[in-house]
Design a protein with these regions (language model features):
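Outer membrane beta-barrel
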Residues: 1-41, 196-200, 221-226
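Detector for outer-membrane/organellar transmembrane beta-barrel domains
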Residues: 28-188, 195-201, 205
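Short proline/glycine-enriched turn/loop segments at secondary-structure junctions
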Residues: 135-137, 191, 209-210, 238-243
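Tryptophan-centered motif/residue detector
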Residues: 157, 171, 226, 255-256
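Conserved active-site loop/cleft motifs that coordinate metal ions or position small ligands
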Residues: 178-180, 213-222
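Outer-membrane beta-barrel "beta-signal"
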Residues: 201, 212-213, 240-256
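Outer-membrane beta-barrel biogenesis signature
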Residues: 207-218, 229
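Low-complexity, intrinsically disordered Gly/Pro/Thr-rich segments
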Residues: 230-239
Length: 256
């Protein structure tokens, strides 16, 4: 169990910096059917107040932001040391001040405040698998489904579906061929409805025959295309008037 406080110095009221307080409780490594289980629960409160002109990014009005609260919870199922890898399935749901959770727990940032923060909602489900049946091949598929409603989505339900796969073939102890292909579809009523597809090929040098062996040095080539709805929204300035793109380069990846 933990108490976590987060504040935004760029947003102020007569009460000081806008702050959110969380009480977070978690229980992991529960042995059960088909593997290990975990659960978490978070309760969050944000004290509102009168925002002075310009204190809220993107707003020029004096706004009285109401105090809000909310809860979030999650359920995780894992199977470790499974076919040379692991399996993790996670479902999370949050409301109001606790709706901006990320990863396996609570959010550590405060979103732009609005009069409708109490109506914010988020549902997120992810399935992540790593398989390495031999020392010559490994593969990692992932699936994600999210529905979200908040200030950034104009209080409409935004839906995001994403899935992809990354195989890796080990040619020697230090040389391997890897890559990935993925697909995303995003829908926000009245704003956009579109998709993006991407594939990457990358020969790389690493320390061993393990999928997560690091550090690695890789050369990569990537091709992506996306629907016309996303023209100007994907790829930044170099691809702002296009619906496809190609890029390449060198990349070093290291963890600690």
């Amino acid at each position: 169990m933990a108490f976590i406080g987060v504040a935004r110095p760029d947003v102020t009221t007569q009460n000081g910096n806008l702050a959110t307080s969380h009480i977070d409780a978690r229980v992991y490594d529960i042995n059960g059917p088909l593997g290990s289980w975990g659960v978490w629960f978070d309760y969050a409160t944000t004290k509102g107040g009168q925002m002075t002109a310009g204190s809220v990014p993107g707003s020029s009005d004096v706004t009285n932001i109401p105090s809000t609260s909310g809860y979030a919870y999650g359920i995780r199922h894992q199977r470790l040391e499974w076919h040379g890898g692991y399996h993790t399935f996670l479902i999370q749901y949050g409301t109001g001040a606790a709706s901006n959770f990320s990863g396996p727990g609570i959010g550590t940032t405060i979103p732009t405040p609005s009069l409708d923060t109490a109506r914010s909602r988020q549902f997120l489900a992810t399935e992540q698998i790593v398989l390495q049946p031999t020392d010559k091949f490994a593969v990692m598929p992932i699936v994600l489904f999210q529905r979200m409603r908040n200030f950034n989505t104009q209080n409409q339900w935004q839906q995001w579906i994403s899935f992809g796969v990354r195989p890796q073939v080990f040619l020697t102890k230090h040389l391997s061929l890897t890559g990935d292909c993925g697909f995303d579809h995003t829908n926000l009523p009245g704003a956009y409805d579109g998709w993006l597809r991407k594939c990457t090929f990358a020969p790389q040098i690493g320390p061993d025959r393990k999928f997560f062996g690091r550090p690695v040095l890789r050369a990569f080539v990537t091709y992506a295309n996306w629907s016309r709805t996303f023209r100007g929204l994907v790829g930044g300035v170099p691809f702002q008037n296009q619906t496809s793109g190609f890029t390449y380069g060198l990349q070093v990846e290291h963890w600690w």
